[in-house]
């Protein structure tokens, strides 16, 4: 799974950037072009959408924005175009609308109907209410980060055995985002070795 790349922004357009990473250039669709500056070096969270005809990349500056994009396009009737329109208003705002069940405001966005909004709320409200609740709380101990990372990895589709293996030697001082990234790397490394054997 491609989660992120480290690289440099070569060009910024209203709808996409050209991103250079490991001596290769990528055209990556984005939200909120004002968040991207030419010649800036950054970690870009990437979602890769592939079919038999083409591969399209979508880039995000925040991990949870990537997760929300993936959640939105999993809803019947919500494609990447509509998901980007929603996220262009700020992922935190859209996540809050979903968590609070505010389908009326969601229905005011272009190309999205009331049926779509009800489906989004039905399928995603509980998940994002928990996500946002965790953001608002200050953990009483670093072990809470392990718990949050475990839940995030479950939401991303990893199996319990994979998660246990990936987090058993984790650094408790790491934040949730770092724990998740390192866990995915560890799982991917093991999968790669198994594929070669």
From Swiss-Prot:
CDD domains: UBA_RuvA_C. It holds the Pfam family HHH_5. One of its GO terms (molecular function) is four-way junction helicase activity. Its main location: cytoplasm. The RuvA-RuvB-RuvC complex processes Holliday junction (HJ) DNA during genetic recombination and DNA repair, while the RuvA-RuvB complex plays an important role in the rescue of blocked DNA replication forks via replication fork reversal (RFR). RuvA specifically binds to HJ cruciform DNA, conferring on it an open structure. The RuvB hexamer acts as an ATP-dependent pump, pulling dsDNA into and through the RuvAB complex. HJ branch migration allows RuvC to scan DNA until it finds its consensus sequence, where it cleaves and resolves the cruciform DNA. Homotetramer. Forms an RuvA(8)-RuvB(12)-Holliday junction (HJ) complex. HJ DNA is sandwiched between 2 RuvA tetramers; dsDNA enters through RuvA and exits via RuvB. An RuvB hexamer assembles on each DNA strand where it exits the tetramer. Each RuvB hexamer is contacted by two RuvA subunits (via domain III) on 2 adjacent RuvB subunits; this complex drives branch migration. In the full resolvosome a probable DNA-RuvA(4)-RuvB(12)-RuvC(2) complex forms which resolves the HJ. This is Holliday junction branch migration complex subunit RuvA. The gene is ruvA.
């Amino acid at each position: 799974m491609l989660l992120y790349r480290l690289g440099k922004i070569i060009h910024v357009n209203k709808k996409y950037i050209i991103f250079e990473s490991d001596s290769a250039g990528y055209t990556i669709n984005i939200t909120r072009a004002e968040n991207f500056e030419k010649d800036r070096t950054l970690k870009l969270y990437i979602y890769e959408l592939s079919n038999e005809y083409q591969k399209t990349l979508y880039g995000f500056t925040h991990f949870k924005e990537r997760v929300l994009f993936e959640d939105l396009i999993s809803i019947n009737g919500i494609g990447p175009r509509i998901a980007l329109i929603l996220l262009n208003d700020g992922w935190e705002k859209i996540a809050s609308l979903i968590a609070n069940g505010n389908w009326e405001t969601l229905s005011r966005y272009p190309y999205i109907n009331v049926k779509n909004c009800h489906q989004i709320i039905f399928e995603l409200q509980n998940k994002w209410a928990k996500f946002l609740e965790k953001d608002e709380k200050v953990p009483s101990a670093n072990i809470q980060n392990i718990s949050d990372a475990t839940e995030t990895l479950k939401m991303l589709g990893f199996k319990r055995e994979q998660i246990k293996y990936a987090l058993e030697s984790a650094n408790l001082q790491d934040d949730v985002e770092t724990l998740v990234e390192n866990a995915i790397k560890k799982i991917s490394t093991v999968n790669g070795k198994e594929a070669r054997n």
